[in-house]
Amino acid sequence: MALGSELDLTELNEKVLADGKKLVLPVVFGKDLIFREVKGLTEEYFAIGSFGIREPKEDLPLWDPKEERSNTLWLLPGVAFDRGCRRLGQGGGYYDRTLERLRAFQRAGDTIAGVAFSCQIADRIPTEEWDASLDKVISPGEIYINQHI
């Protein structure tokens, strides 16, 4: 679910569900993110979690990135991105740690992409050595592809 100025993916999530695809959404769990599968976007599937964010309820099935799957698209929010597919988050490191885990189980056909408004994309953003790069950054006007992965 979108936080602050992040791009709201509700319409896309509705389309994913309407197409019969699996939709998993993040839940803050300690210093990490875990993912739970949702079958709808109504209140019956959500509770207010950490940081006041709507998160999937804890009785929903956990998603394991090791499970058998194909052509998975992970869409990540951010405060800012750059054309080199680097991401600036909220500062907690949740998605950096999650990306490290996801990369360990990434298969051919999987894509890890940031989603942003065009105004959130810069030529270059400051990053640290632990900041993970994405495969792509998608905005309403353009798609940037990481040439170094």
Regions found by a protein language model. Give the residues of each.
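Short amphipathic alpha-helical surface micro-motifs
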Residues: V16-D19, I34-R36, Y94-T98, F117-I121
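N-terminal active-site beta-alpha-beta segment that forms phosphate/nucleotide-binding
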Residues: M1-R69
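Surface-exposed, charge/polar-rich loops and edge strands
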Residues: K57-W74, R83-R87, D96-I149
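Short secondary-structure transition/capping segments
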Residues: S50, W74-F81
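Short glycine-rich anion-binding loops that position phosphate/pyrophosphate groups of nucleotides
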Residues: A2-S5, V79-R83
